């Protein structure tokens, strides 16, 4: 039989769909409730085939926005069109999609596309409510082949909601067992607790559909899933129960990786954390020693120890993963190397001769210290942690807590879910500074996910925490009694502020210093701390070595209190009550708010720094002509340290309150001071005299705020592009009070909102220890400029 293929979305469209899913606050289960009584889709039957109009309504309920017309149409066609057939009866295994295209396929695609376009045309409500008869006499599909076509060539295309829901649920984050159970109940339409062969094939076809988008080679996955289906039906009666379905899925590792393996609970119990990977150089299976082949993702690789296997070998009797903690703390216990064989195309650390990638049996490397040796060259069995020993928590430094006193709980505590959570004690190596790594996987697109995997390998997985799993608190509690530990915040400025808030609430006797690995765009705080505007794929080992030598600086943090007037209606929720970077009101907040609203509606248009800059330019240009915040002085009152600032003679459209010398991704609104004329004030008295303000220096640890006026969007653009050095200096003070009498756009640390009439008070809260990045190396041209300025 010829191999059948789905009509697929393009990779760009698939990325679009993923971004819409990530930005939506709803889960697929929430969208299904719209078909219940009182929901927006109550007039439709979810068990019947649905038309394009109902499909659009369902996607709007799920994603909370309307999909772009091309993406919506193509996604609908992906579920309604006939699968494409190979022209040959015996196709080459692993053939590309392009080889499957034929003239008949193109005609069929064009015919269906025309019908979909007709279906996409505005219909009356009666047409939208029209239902198609269910295909009850469907022929049972053979295992692992696409289902029977569900649209006739003479009728408008329709889709089955089950297929759409199953497909979308695979894109969502969540536990694999929950996804398996959800898909089972979704296709168990008669609610008898059993799935027949055709229903299981429909589910597996959707899994293969997703696998192709993730660049998996289905030639390996297809027989594994087929074997899984055969193994589930123990009594060979053609039906599978929920228990059999979940058990079969949870014991098939490639399927777990496809569903999104949850490795949060496997840090140290000997279980591997598998991920599909494409290898850029020849790589061999650690089990069978045969090279991994394929043009897509060729095999499974453990995130923790880099043990690599074929998909077919992963279920064999392979060695367990490295242990990340010691079972019991014994006096005098020493750390031994944890060896992994093969795939080390580097030089031997003893004889300094090259190790070939195929020498899987003759060479191995240590997971902890990264030392690589030929077997004949191995020296001591003792491991000291290697070049990252100052940061890494070796397994001998972590042991479970034991309680010997009567009446106390055993070696763990019960979580909110009723699960037993192990508690640990950290006894670091003397003279070291263990590093707590907190990663926001959503920052920088998928950059955060890659950073998380890399740190899992570079350090002990137990000291690396995913902020999606409970936020910063679990990591801070794990390190609570650890002396001299440091924190690395991987994410944007919002992530850093979140971590600093949690450190405040944790009530540490001594606050740990925080370094920043900036992800995404903006990152004004990271720029001021010399960590750069965004991680661009450099060596993480070098960044960790820089943290070892980082000097400390105290960062001022400010309390932001917004007091609305009693007679006005409630506006948007204030994003933060603490300010770390800046607060602004007026023209720049208006542009930021429009940018924020547009990004929520169309996240796929904001997936690069260049696109973000172009959108800011467009919004800034339109704001220049609209001037929505002109005559700002008529609508606000400004007080600095209790003294009013006269704005009547100044034509401003915006006011910014600065704590750090960076805004809008590196722009300094306060401006630079000549070093020979700058004055660092020791007193905390406010300054509003324009002559004195010329010599006031901005410092993120002086417990002072800088107040700057903006004349409009045009001036903002000039400052951003360097055509103008700074805005208008209004004051330098220790507290600010602003009163407004109309609805105005505001933003704090890059998060905008619309605020009705209110009183805003900004006062000093505390200081947080931060680590500075290494000084930037001066280039030849910067040295020339400095020498000219001295002359």
Swiss-Prot record:
InterPro entries from the entry? ATP-NAD_kinase_N, C1-like_sf, C1_DGKgamma_rpt2, DAG_kinase_typeI_N, DGK, DGK_typeI_N_sf, Diacylglycerol_kin_accessory, Diacylglycerol_kinase_cat_dom
Q: Does the keyword Ribonucleoprotein apply?
A: no
Taxonomic lineage: Eukaryota, Metazoa, Chordata, Craniata, Vertebrata
Annotated catalysed reactions: a 1,2-diacyl-sn-glycerol + ATP = a 1,2-diacyl-sn-glycero-3-phosphate + ADP + H(+); 1,2-didecanoyl-sn-glycerol + ATP = 1,2-didecanoyl-sn-glycero-3-phosphate + ADP + H(+); 1-octadecanoyl-2-(5Z,8Z,11Z,14Z-eicosatetraenoyl)-sn-glycerol + ATP = 1-octadecanoyl-2-(5Z,8Z,11Z,14Z-eicosatetraenoyl)-sn-glycero-3-phosphate + ADP + H(+); 1,2-di-(9Z-octadecenoyl)-sn-glycerol + ATP = 1,2-di-(9Z-octadecenoyl)-sn-glycero-3-phosphate + ADP + H(+)
Purpose of the protein: Diacylglycerol kinase that converts diacylglycerol/DAG into phosphatidic acid/phosphatidate/PA and regulates the respective levels of these two bioactive lipids. Thereby, acts as a central switch between the signaling pathways activated by these second messengers with different cellular targets and opposite effects in numerous biological processes. Has no apparent specificity with regard to the acyl compositions of diacylglycerol. Specifically expressed in the cerebellum where it controls the level of diacylglycerol which in turn regulates the activity of protein kinase C gamma.
Instruction: Specify residue ranges for compositional bias: Polar residues.
Output: 94-103
The GO biological-process annotations, alphabetized, read as: diacylglycerol metabolic process; glycerolipid metabolic process; intracellular signal transduction; lipid phosphorylation; negative regulation of phospholipase C/protein kinase C signal transduction; phosphatidic acid biosynthetic process; phospholipase C-activating G protein-coupled receptor signaling pathway; platelet activation
Q: Which domain of life is it from?
A: Eukaryota
Domain DAGKc residues, every copy: 430-564
Region of interest (Disordered), residue spans: 82-103, 117-154, 768-791
Name the residues that bind Ca(2+) 1. 188, 190, 192, 199
Activity regulation field: The activity is calcium-dependent. Requires phosphatidylserine for maximal activity.
Protein name as annotated: Diacylglycerol kinase gamma
What EC designation does it have? 2.7.1.107
On whether Calcium is a keyword of this UniProt record, the answer is: yes
The listed locations are: Membrane; Cytoplasm, Cytosol; Cytoplasm, Cytoskeleton
SMART domains membership: C1, DAGKa, DAGKc, EFh
CC per GO annotation: cytoskeleton; cytosol; membrane; plasma membrane
Q: In which tissues is it expressed?
A: Predominantly expressed in retina and in a much lesser extent in the brain. Other tissues contain extremely low levels of DGK-gamma.
């Amino acid at each position: 039989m010829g191999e059948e293929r789905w009509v697929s979305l393009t990779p760009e469209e698939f990325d679009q769909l993923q971004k819409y899913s990530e930005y939506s606050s709803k889960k697929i289960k929430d969208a299904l409730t719209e078909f219940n009584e009182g929901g927006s889709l109550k007039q439709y039957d979810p068990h019947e085939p649905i038309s394009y109009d109902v499909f659009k309504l369902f996607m709007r309920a799920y994603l909370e926005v309307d999909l772009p017309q091309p993406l919506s149409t193509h996604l609908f066609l992906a579920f309604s069109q006939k699968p494409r057939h190979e022209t040959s009866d015996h196709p080459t295994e692993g053939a590309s999609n392009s080889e499957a295209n034929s003239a008949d396929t193109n005609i069929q695609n064009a015919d269906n596309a025309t019908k979909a376009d007709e279906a996409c045309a505005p219909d009356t409500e009666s047409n939208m409510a029209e239902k198609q008869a269910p295909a009850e006499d469907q022929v049972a599909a053979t295992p692992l082949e696409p289902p029977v076509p569900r649209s006739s060539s003479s009728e408008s295309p329709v889709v089955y909601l089950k297929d759409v829901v199953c497909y979308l649920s695979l894109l969502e984050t969540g536990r694999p067992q929950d996804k398996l159970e959800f898909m089972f109940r979704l296709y168990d339409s008669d609610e008898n607790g059993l799935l027949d062969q055709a229903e299981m094939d429909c589910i597996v076809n959707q899994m293969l559909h997703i696998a192709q988008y993730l660049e998996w080679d289905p030639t390996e996955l297809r027989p594994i899933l087929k074997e899984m289906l055969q193994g589930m039906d123990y009594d060979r009666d053609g039906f599978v129960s929920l228990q059999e379905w979940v058990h079969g899925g949870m014991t098939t590792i490639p399927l777990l990786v496809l569903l999104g393996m949850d490795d949060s609970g496997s840090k140290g119990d000997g279980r591997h954390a598998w991920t599909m990977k494409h290898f850029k150089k020849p790589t061999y299976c650690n089990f069978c020693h045969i090279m991994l082949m394929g043009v897509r993702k060729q095999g499974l690789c453990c995130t923790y120890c880099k043990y690599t296997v074929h998909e077919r070998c992963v279920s064999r009797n392979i060695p367990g993963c490295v242990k990340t903690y010691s079972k019991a703390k014994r006096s005098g216990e020493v750390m031994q190397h944890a060896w992994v064989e093969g795939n080390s195309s580097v030089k031997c650390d003893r004889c300094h001769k090259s190790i070939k990638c195929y020498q899987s049996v003759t060479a191995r490397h240590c997971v902890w210290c990264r030392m690589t040796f030929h077997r004949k060259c191995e020296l001591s069995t003792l491991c000291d942690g290697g070049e990252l020993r100052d940061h890494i928590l070796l397994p001998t430094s972590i042991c479970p807590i034991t309680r010997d006193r009567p009446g106390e709980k055993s070696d763990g505590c019960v979580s909110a879910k009723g699960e037993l959570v192990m508690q640990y004690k950290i006894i670091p190596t003397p003279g070291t500074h263990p590093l707590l790594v907190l990663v926001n996987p959503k920052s920088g697109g998928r950059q955060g996910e890659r950073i998380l995997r890399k740190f899992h390998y570079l350090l002990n997985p137990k000291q690396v925490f995913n902020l999606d799993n409970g936020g910063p608190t679990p990591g801070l509690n794990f390190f609570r009694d650890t002396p001299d530990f440091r924190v690395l915040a991987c994410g944007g400025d919002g992530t850093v502020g979140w971590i600093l808030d949690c450190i405040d609430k944790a009530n540490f006797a001594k606050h740990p210093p925080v370094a920043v690995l900036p992800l995404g765009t903006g990152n004004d705080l990271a720029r001021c701390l010399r960590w750069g505007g965004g991680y661009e794929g450099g060596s993480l080992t070098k960044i960790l070595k820089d943290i070892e030598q980082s000097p400390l600086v105290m960062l001022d943090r400010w309390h932001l209190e917004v007091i609305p007037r009693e007679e006005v209606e409630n506006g948007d929720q204030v994003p933060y009550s603490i300010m770390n970077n800046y607060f602004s009101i007026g023209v720049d907040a208006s542009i930021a708010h429009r940018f924020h609203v547009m990004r929520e509606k169309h996240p796929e248009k904001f997936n690069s720094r260049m696109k973000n800059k172009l959108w800011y330019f467009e919004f800034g240009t339109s704001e220049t002509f609209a001037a929505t915040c002109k005559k700002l002085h008529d609508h606000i009152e400004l007080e600095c340290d209790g003294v009013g600032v006269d704005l009547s003679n100044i034509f401003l459209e915006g006011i910014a309150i600065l704590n750090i010398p960076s805004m809008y991704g590196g722009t300094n609104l306060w401006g630079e001071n000549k070093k020979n004329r700058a004055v660092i004030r020791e007193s905390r008295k406010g300054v509003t005299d324009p002559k004195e303000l010329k010599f006031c220096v901005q410092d993120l640890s002086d417990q002072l705020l800088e107040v700057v006026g903006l004349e409009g969007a045009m001036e903002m653009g000039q400052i951003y592009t360097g055509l103008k050095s700074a805005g208008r200096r209004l004051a330098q003070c220790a507290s600010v009070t602003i009163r407004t009498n109309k609805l105005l756009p505001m933003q704090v640390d890059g998060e905008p909102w619309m605020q009705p009439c209110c009183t805003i008070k900004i006062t000093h809260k505390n200081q947080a220890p931060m680590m500075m990045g290494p000084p930037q190396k001066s280039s030849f041209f910067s040295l020339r400029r400095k020498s000219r300025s001295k002359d």
